[in-house]
Swiss-Prot record:
<feature type="repeat" description="WD 9">
    <location>
        <begin position="825"/>
        <end position="866"/>
    </location>
</feature>
<comment type="function">
    <text>Associates with components of the nexin-dynein regulatory complex (N-DRC), a key regulator of ciliary/flagellar motility, and might act as an inner dynein arm (IDA) hub or linkage.</text>
</comment>
<feature type="domain" description="EF-hand">
    <location>
        <begin position="81"/>
        <end position="116"/>
    </location>
</feature>
<keyword id="KW-0677">Repeat</keyword>
<dbReference type="InterPro" id="IPR019775">
    <property type="entry name" value="WD40_repeat_CS"/>
</dbReference>
<feature type="repeat" description="WD 7">
    <location>
        <begin position="719"/>
        <end position="766"/>
    </location>
</feature>
<dbReference type="GO" id="GO:0005509">
    <property type="term" value="F:calcium ion binding"/>
</dbReference>
<feature type="repeat" description="WD 6">
    <location>
        <begin position="633"/>
        <end position="671"/>
    </location>
</feature>
<dbReference type="GO" id="GO:0005929">
    <property type="term" value="C:cilium"/>
</dbReference>
<dbReference type="InterPro" id="IPR015943">
    <property type="entry name" value="WD40/YVTN_repeat-like_dom_sf"/>
</dbReference>
<dbReference type="InterPro" id="IPR011992">
    <property type="entry name" value="EF-hand-dom_pair"/>
</dbReference>
<dbReference type="InterPro" id="IPR036322">
    <property type="entry name" value="WD40_repeat_dom_sf"/>
</dbReference>
<dbReference type="InterPro" id="IPR020472">
    <property type="entry name" value="G-protein_beta_WD-40_rep"/>
</dbReference>
<dbReference type="InterPro" id="IPR002048">
    <property type="entry name" value="EF_hand_dom"/>
</dbReference>
<dbReference type="InterPro" id="IPR001680">
    <property type="entry name" value="WD40_rpt"/>
</dbReference>
<dbReference type="InterPro" id="IPR051242">
    <property type="entry name" value="WD-EF-hand_domain"/>
</dbReference>
<feature type="compositionally biased region" description="Polar residues">
    <location>
        <begin position="695"/>
        <end position="711"/>
    </location>
</feature>
């Protein structure tokens, strides 16, 4: 069945073919490949007909067809095609020549054919490149290595003089560190190579002093050397690092030196420690530990062992790498003997087994494709050769086309293509299957003849780095034109929802703002060039949702109406370009947060981290900012902010700090961080405040990791792990200050979501929402029932947080809330999220860098894209989630119980002695187990009575009405016509006046008072037997009551 479904899904976009043999107009998905074969022209409807032909009325019975039966039935059932064509299809399916085929064989062949066509299509796609760009580097010497850190989405470059540069995800230079000490500079030592040890958050740097230093990225200091490996016999000039993704403790660091020696350190407990610390070592964790190479060779360190060989015999090792699929170390030199050496170790032997490739004139570099099992070599003889690792005699393919020696090669793994770069600055892209050059790029590279080139292709982001001495060039791939619908021409940056107009507002990097109808997806209007050519980074709506505020990278915020008229321009950057991250509109001010602008000319930081605009200044078009009284309390760029009425403001930054502010006084009073906490002293405070931790260098929590609580955490770690990208208050959770529980949610670095209690300054919960994708963003609905998170790969996850972290606890919760839905509506980074409820239906709106805006529901709803040809109708396609129906039922039950309580509380007009008597009698029927709760019940009853004794007539009517609200009152029936009675038609006949007659006098009765002789009493009125029986009954009742009282005592 899986094969059947797969075939139908793969060809879902095809059209039904005509029912005539002349099939001339049927356009299917397969015709895009330019093939006219029968199997490529069958549509979904044709496959459904063929499937029914193979179905048996008896369950679990497989129908097989011979060649004659198949050709005869197919021409009749499908309705087009010749018997010869179906016979050829039968022969292709019947590879084993059994003489018959069934449905499973047919679908397996079709799936394999589709897969091969898809692979061929990918291989022939030629990437389109943007213009060549040179990055503004600060390196003064040759760039030795470019690496990408997946954990933090940062690039690192290092140059020969030892300057390490840190680049952001968007290739903005953030910081530089001199990695060499003063003593090293005096010796004129150079950096030769750099590798990233991602599983342990370290980097290794090789020096010409025959040393390899290991630097901890999580160090409290700016850049601390943790291990120093010295005593090597030769200078290492190339390195490579590999770790097992299934067991991160297993890793291998390999390096080659100028003596032709290839060495490798195999770590067995990398997550615990790379090397064993001797007992005599200093207890200070930040002190550098020195390891001698001789110690490793002797086996003193049990957590690692050494592998090495000398087959290159004195030639410089230009490149070395360990490949897990081959389980071998591959190295290369520029010599024509032993140009490429593969070394591996068998389990029963200690020495390495080796095999070598002899390539004429040697090679400069190589690369290995594990799926194709090919080694590509960059030959000095202008040729690119493809080698089978197990065939050393000759290459399996030779790529001709370069007119100069090839200095770099690298596979485009996903497309099965190969890059090659030659000495004459010509870049070629090869189709491996056909061994043809499909693209030649000769950009305006630097014209210097003598240069050292570094080649690095980041396939995940489509970026190609080529260095020329100390210059770094970038070639970025253009996003390929796909069949996916685009909402904007450029990447979408922000999305908002206007609940009054029921419209979605979106912005992009091209300074365009678009308006969409949420009900149908139709575009209403569009504003272009809102900030010239500058990117719109964020937007906001005012409280009345009648004004739109747009923030741009040009350092301004503009206030618009919905007719496209700009009323004010807020000069945030003070005539300078700054990155605005968020606009927060409060009651009496507008806050703008963002990144500080660094002026490289003056080497100073310009601008404020928080900018405030007050309404009294809004009488002009250009409005200048005022001073934020709290000053700059963050140590890093502010990325987000949130406000909780009446006066709580929070801001989050790159280093993971969340600062709590008093919005009225504009003073900061506390700092939250996952690893430590500290208090900030306000300007208006006269008494010094006690710090929760003695500076930022000491953790406040006793269980805090010592490696993550530094004075100034290394920026890569803080941005990758704790960066706060979004903040959100859970405003629907009332009285959290009394009941406890989380009322603030933050998310960001490394895919973590954290729940905070700002009143107790406590981190209550932390869970990993998205793993291995870097930073994430989030949004929640107004009732705080659902939390939506989005990552850099376009994935969305919807979580149920209605019952999550409602109470405070001593231990931090690490269990994630219930995951309702996980899907991928976008192909690129999700830039903005918004949750709305038009018409009571909860919707999630997401925008992405793939130029699209999507809208969907909570539970398995379809995904619509704004801009698609077919409009939708939300009310006909979405339903409330099941969780909501349960909530409605529970609310109904709650209402019923409340109504019953209200009915038990009588109205003040209905109180009487009888009611008092009933209440007094009810106290004798109390169960023994409920005697303890009498006081509580009395208070509840009195409270209920107080509530009912409100002197409002409306309240009485409301409660009396609630008594009959369960009755089904229908429309009254129409009365039939009634004939008027005779006395109405002729009243004089029946009501005429009679003549008055004289009334007879009534005689008065004689008075009893005069004739009464004696007074009656009970003794004379009732018989004696009845009175005697009554006296005995009273005595018996009194005796019983006395006995009850004695028993109680």
């Amino acid at each position: 069945m899986s094969c059947q479904k797969a075939v139908l899904e793969l060809n879902i976009g095809s059209q039904l073919g005509p029912k005539s043999p002349e099939r001339t107009e049927g356009v299917t998905a397969f015709e895009d490949y330019g093939t006219g074969l029968l199997e490529n022209q069958l549509s979904v409807g044709d496959f459904v007909k063929i499937q029914k032909a193979f179905e048996s009325p008896q369950p679990r019975k497989i129908i097989c067809m011979s060649r004659e039966d198949f050709t005869q039935k197919m021409t009749e059932i499908v309705g087009w095609g010749t018997k010869e064509e179906y016979g050829e299809l039968f022969d292709k399916v019947d590879v084993a020549q059994d003489g018959f085929i069934n449905w499973d064989k047919l679908t397996s062949f079709i799936l394999l054919e589709l897969y091969e066509q898809d692979e061929r299509a990918k291989a022939t796609v030629v990437p389109q490149w943007k213009d060549l760009e040179f990055l503004p580097v600060k390196h003064k010497d040759t760039i030795q290595k470019v690496i990408f850190l997946k954990n933090s989405s940062h690039y690192l470059t290092i140059s020969k003089e030892g300057l390490l540069a840190i680049w952001g995800e968007h290739l903005k230079l953030q910081e530089t560190f001199p990695i060499t000490s003063d003593a090293t500079k005096l010796k004129h030592l150079w950096v030769t190579s750099l590798v990233s040890l991602e599983n342990v958050n370290k980097i290794a740097v090789a020096f010409t002093s025959k040393e390899v230093c290991f630097y901890d990225l999580l160090s409290k200091e700016e850049f601390a050397c943790q291990y120093k490996l010295q005593g090597l016999k030769g200078t290492p000039i190339c390195m490579d690092y590999w770790y097992d993704p299934l067991d991160a403790n297993e890793s291998i660091l390999s390096f080659g030196d100028i003596t032709g020696k290839v060495q490798a350190i195999a770590f067995t407990a990398a997550l615990i420690s790379l090397f064993e610390r001797p007992a005599s070592a200093c207890e200070d964790g930040e002190a550098t530990m020195t390891i001698n190479w001789a110690e490793l060779l002797s086996g003193c360190h049990k957590c690692c062992h050494i592998l090495e060989h000398k087959l290159h015999q004195g030639d410089w090792v230009r490149q070395v790498t360990y490949n897990a699929s081959l389980d071998a170390i591959i190295s290369s030199t520029t010599s024509n003997t032993n140009s490429v050496v593969m070394a591996w170790r068998e389990k029963s032997k200690k020495r390495l087994n080796m095999t070598s490739f002899n390539i004429a004139q040697g090679i400069h570099a190589f690369d290995y494709h594990s799926r194709l099992n090919l080694i590509a070599t960059a030959g000095i003889n202008n040729k690119v050769c493809l080698w089978n690792p197990y065939v050393v005699s000759k290459p399996v393919g030779v790529l001709w086309g370069h007119s100069a020696s090839v200095i770099a090669v690298q596979f485009f793994v996903e497309r099965k293509q190969l890059f090659s770069f030659s000495k004459d600055k010509v870049l070629r892209l090869w189709d491996i299957q056909h061994q043809l050059s499909i693209q030649r790029i000769a950009c305006s590279f630097p014209k210097s003849q003598d240069f050292r080139c570094l080649f690095h292709f980041d396939e995940a982001h489509g970026r190609l780095f080529i260095s020329f001495n100390n210059q770094l060039a970038l070639l970025a791939m253009k996003s390929e034109a796909s069949k996916r619908v685009k909402s904007h021409e450029k990447a979408v940056t922000c999305v908002l929802y206007n609940s009054i107009l029921k419209q979605v507002i979106s912005s992009d990097t091209g300074s365009t703002v678009s308006f969409w109808m949420i009900d149908t997806g139709q575009k209403i209007k569009q504003f272009t060039g809102c900030h010239g050519n500058a990117e719109i980074s964020t937007m906001a709506l005012d409280a009345n949702e009648t004004r739109l505020l747009t923030g741009s990278t040009d350092g301004t915020v503009k206030i618009w109406d919905f007719n496209g008229y700009c009323h004010h321009t807020l000069n945030v950057g003070q005539d300078g370009a700054v990155d605005i991250s968020q606009i927060l509109i409060l009651k009496k001010k507008i806050l703008v947060t963002g990144w500080e602008r660094y002026d490289y000319a003056s080497w100073k930081t310009i601008g404020r981290a928080i900018t405030v605009f007050r309404p009294q200044n809004f009488n002009q078009f250009f409005i200048q900012p005022e001073e934020w009284k709290g000053g700059i309390q963050h140590h890093d760029d502010i990325l987000c902010a949130a406000f909780l009425p009446p006066q709580t403001l929070v801001t989050g930054s790159y280093d993971g700090e969340i600062v709590l502010w008093n919005n009225s006084t504009e003073n900061a009073h506390h700092v939250l961080h996952p690893d430590y906490q500290r208090l900030l002293k306000s300007k208006l405070d006269t008494k010094p405040q006690k710090l929760l931790s003695a500076g930022r260098s000491q953790p406040s929590h006793p269980m805090a990791d010592h490696s993550t609580t530094g004075v100034r955490n290394f920026e890569i770690d803080t941005e990758g792990k704790n960066a706060v990208m979004r903040l959100c208050f859970l405003k629907a959770r009332k009285n959290t200050a009394v009941t406890g529980g989380a009322n603030l949610v933050s998310c960001g670095g490394s895919g973590y979501v954290r729940f905070w209690d700002i009143y107790k300054k406590q981190l209550l919960a932390e869970f990993l929402a998205h793993s291995g994708v870097g930073s994430i963003i989030m949004s929640t609905d107004k009732m705080n029932r659902y939390l939506t998170t989005g990552d850099l790969d376009g994935w969305l996850k919807i979580w149920n947080i209605e019952e999550y972290c409602l109470n405070s606890s001593k231990n931090k919760i690490t269990k994630a809330p219930t995951l309702i839905r996980s899907f991928q509506p976008h192909e690129d980074r999700i830039s903005s999220l918004e949750m709305c409820e038009p018409g009571g239906q909860l919707l999630i709106i997401s925008s992405s860098a793939d130029c699209s805006i999507c809208v969907t529901g909570v539970c398995n709803a379809p995904v619509w894209i704004f801009g698609q040809a077919k409009h939708w109708h939300i009310e006909n396609c979405l339903f409330l989630p099941k969780r909501d129906t349960n909530l409605v039922e529970s609310e109904i039950q709650k209402e019923i119980s409340l109504f019953s309580k209200e009915e038990s509380c009588l109205d003040p007009t209905e109180h009487s002695l009888l009611n008092k008597k009933n209440k007094d009698d009810s106290t004798y029927n109390v169960r023994p187990s409920e005697d303890i709760n009498l006081d509580i019940k009395y208070k509840e009853r009195s409270t209920c009575m107080k509530e009912t004794q409100k002197p409002y007539y409306g309240e009485v009517i409301k409660k009396s009405f609630s008594t009959f609200r369960s009755l089904n009152i229908g429309a009254l029936e129409e009365l039939p016509e009634v004939n008027k009675p005779a006395f109405l038609l002729d009243p004089e006949k029946y009501f005429r006046k009679e003549p008055e007659e004289e009334r007879p006098q009534i005689l008065e009765a004689p008075s009893l008072f005069k004739t009464l002789k004696a007074v009656f009493d009970e003794k004379n009125l009732f018989p004696k037997e009845i009175l005697h029986h009554e006296r005995k009954a009273k005595q018996l009742c009194q005796e019983k009551s006395c006995e009850v009282k004695k028993n109680k005592k």
